[in-house]
Amino acid sequence: MRHQCRVPLLGRPADQRKALLRGLTTQLIREGRVTTTKARAKALRDEAERMITLAKNGSLASRRRVLGYVYDKQLVHALFDKAPTRYGDRNGGYTRITRTVPRRGDNAEMAIIELV
């Protein structure tokens, strides 16, 4: 039984949710930090940490998995070059989520997710 084994749905169909997380992950790897809602930041954390762990592994299969997920090809190659030196001694916990002020329009809880 799959009781309480849920992914964050984010109020979207599966295809839109996957595209949203792919876009946020690409942006986080490119910029180093992203301001988004708290729920999206928590969902993004899992995906971003998975991509960095694959980049630390450095195998061809890992590179192909990340190339299939991240939108920018040059960004993937840069990630695979920098991740082993930047996160080599760290086992997980590559991101930090910091809460910020609520969004003005709908009072949604906002957060900044950044790479450590």
From Swiss-Prot:
One Pfam family here = Ribosomal_L17
Transmembrane ranges, per UniProt, are none
Alphabetically, the GO molecular function entries are: structural constituent of ribosome
- State the Gene3D superfamilies in the record: Ribosomal protein L17
Q: Does the keyword Ribonucleoprotein apply?
A: yes
One GO term under biological process is: translation
Q: What GO cellular component is one of the record's annotations?
A: cytosolic large ribosomal subunit
Identify the keywords attached in UniProt to this record, alphabetized: Ribonucleoprotein, Ribosomal protein
Family per UniProt?
Answer: Belongs to the bacterial ribosomal protein bL17 family.
Under the heading PANTHER family, the entry gives:
LARGE RIBOSOMAL SUBUNIT PROTEIN BL17M (PTHR14413:SF16), RIBOSOMAL PROTEIN L17 (PTHR14413)
Q: How does it assemble?
A: Part of the 50S ribosomal subunit. Contacts protein L32.
The entry's protein name is: Large ribosomal subunit protein bL17
Species name for this entry? Synechococcus sp. (strain CC9311)
| Taxon lineage | Bacteria, Bacillati, Cyanobacteriota, Cyanophyceae, Synechococcales
UniProt gene name: rplQ
